[in-house]
Amino acid sequence: MPLGLKPTCSVCKTTSSSMWKKGPQGEILCHHCTGRGGAGGGGSCPGAAGGTGGGGGGTGGGFGAATFASTSAAPPQSNGGGGGKQSKQEIHRRSARLRNTKYKSAPAAEKKVSTKGKGRRHIFKLKNPIKAPESVSTIITAESIFYKGVYYQIGDVVSVIDEQDGKPYYAQIRGFVQDQYCEKSAALTWLIPTLASPRDQFDPASYIVGPEEDLPRKMEYLEFVCHAPSEYFKSRSSPFPTVPTRPEKGYIWTHVGPTPAITIKETVANHL
């Protein structure tokens, strides 16, 4: 039997039985009283059976009469007010048990949905594995870059140290290249020294333009020397006031502060 209040037979008032059944009027009957009602005649057959089993003895007849009286008196009691109240109480108890049973069966429904016995390998095998796309090299060219705190522009002079003799060799930057991994490189144009070139420093006036390299070099092997010289390396703009042949716009260099920039007319007048 489920946990809770124990049922009581409406006929014999017993609380223990191997089987409980419900009568036609809603009363609860034990297994013994259910067998009596099914024998026929409101319990007349159990009395007759008791008399027959007793034979000629008076004891058997007395037991049968007592049994008949108890069974015949039981139905009117069940039809009365007290029996009706108890039957309603039992119906209420039964409905409460049914609600508890439904409440307890809810986790069982969740177990059906749960993936029992399926581990992480099953989750990862739901879809077929797909190879990652191959990386495509993307090159971005630029006219200026910022590398290790130094602002490089096209035309700047850099030095490269040779691994064999350890001497510096100078070159001019022709362009900048950046790949998909943000690795920066520069295309160089070598500067050839002359007999008048000093050994300890770089003098732009004593160098001539040499061959151009086809492959760019990484910026980590280059060391900044100076920005683009004004006249010798054919810079389109100059930091110094010169006599221009035609009006020029878009200078890289500018004045810092309230001092106005030198105009072309003032420059020409000073030189004259």
Swiss-Prot record:
Cross-link Glycyl lysine isopeptide (Lys-Gly) (interchain with G-Cter in SUMO2), sequence positions: 265
Gene Ontology CC terms: nucleus
Residue(s) carrying N6-acetyllysine: 167
Zinc finger feature spans (GATA-type): 9-33
Keyword Cell membrane on entry: no
Localization of this protein: Nucleus
Alphabetized GO MF terms: sequence-specific DNA binding; zinc ion binding
Keyword flag Ubl conjugation: yes
Region (Disordered) residue spans: 67-120
GO biological process, one term: chromatin organization
Domain of life from the UniProt record: Eukaryota
Keyword list, A-Z: Acetylation, Isopeptide bond, Metal-binding, Nucleus, Ubl conjugation, Zinc, Zinc-finger
Protein name, per record: GATA zinc finger domain-containing protein 1
Organism listed in the record: Bos taurus
Gene field: GATAD1
